[in-house]
Amino acid sequence: MTDRSPFETDMLTLTRYVMEKGRQAKGTGELTQLLNSMLTAIKAISSAVRKAGLANLYGISGSVNVTGDEVKKLDVLSNSLVINMLQSSYSTCVLVSEENKEAVITAQERRGKYVVCFDPLDGSSNIDCLASIGTIFAIYRKTTEDEPSEKDALQPGRNIVAAGYALYGSATLVALSTGQGVDLFMLDPALGEFVLVEKDVRIKKKGKIFSLNEGYAKYFDAATAEYVQKKKFPEDGSEPYGARYVGSMVADVHRTLVYGGIFMYPANQKSPNGKLRLLYECNPVAYIIEQAGGMATTGTQPVLDVKPESIHQRVPLILGSPEDVQEYLSCVQRNQAGR
């Protein structure tokens, strides 16, 4: 093992990575501008999250967002940061946010060709107890010549140009894919830059962890109940799966990516259409997981194949290691056949 200097002289920062990808694609530079603006917003949100207690940013703002969640002060700040940074990149035309009832249309003089769907601060109900939270985003090209409208955002996840998430935990991390695998970058606070820490991440074929909110067991359908029972009490005498659930989707998904296993937010009696939003929660993480060799399904079809009908549409989400997700789908098929 060779000695390494504590100071890297040829580090691959995320800014450099994005520029290199743009050069390789012989693009116009708009996507590069867009991604760099998104990264600036993420750095600002990371700083705000770490200062939240000192800056009086804990607590609720007194309103409820379009999907029925209480809006936290940090939600409002993060949403404004992302919108302002993306619009000032001169590369977007339509923005869809969890916090806005309608799509945000970029002013004509600032318009570009990209549509961005994002959740500025996922897991914000965990802010006050200092649990990990995150930012999620997916980028699409506008496919029509018409005036920009929210219809431009109603594209299946297969059309994603780039997607990723930021995780604000013990460190700030970005997972990013531009369609050629998944790379992980860690924020170096001394440099103020994201630095590559893992290239072409691959999820395990099979894991040892299942993740879902068992508090809703009363409402589980037969397939979900059967699958969870199999993980807790294996019929073949093998070791049971470990149970892990943070309640912040980015944290749960990232753990699943790193350690393998399965993350589940299936449909149930209480939420027959699922609870997570397709455009800015499910599609981005499904894209990341698939790019890493995993699977993401609604239980009836791949998440990325769903054709959205509205910008805040909800769908069930089951993702993770391919063998684990396939086992869940076998439970679904078996229960459907038995009806």
Swiss-Prot record:
Keyword set, alphabetical order: Allosteric enzyme, Calcium, Carbohydrate metabolism, Cell junction, Cytoplasm, Gluconeogenesis, Hydrolase, Magnesium, Metal-binding, Nucleus, Phosphoprotein
Q: Residues that bind substrate, according to the entry?
A: 122, 213-216, 245-249, 265, 275
* Cofactor dependence: Mg(2+)
Quick one: which residues bind Mg(2+) 2?
98, 119, 121
Tell me where on the tree of life, at the top rank, the source sits: Eukaryota
**Cell compartments where the protein resides:** Cell junction; Cytoplasm; Nucleus; Cytoplasm, Myofibril, Sarcomere, Z line
Cell inner membrane found in the keyword field: no
How the protein is activated or inhibited is described as:
Subject to complex allosteric regulation. The enzyme can assume an active R-state, or an inactive T-state. Intermediate conformations may exist. AMP acts as an allosteric inhibitor. Fructose 2,6-bisphosphate acts as a competitive inhibitor. Strongly inhibited by Ca(2+).
List residues, modification Phosphotyrosine: 216, 219
Coarsely, its chief localization is: other
**Family designation:** Belongs to the FBPase class 1 family.
This protein is called Fructose-1,6-bisphosphatase isozyme 2
Q: What is the lineage of its organism?
A: Eukaryota, Metazoa, Chordata, Craniata, Vertebrata
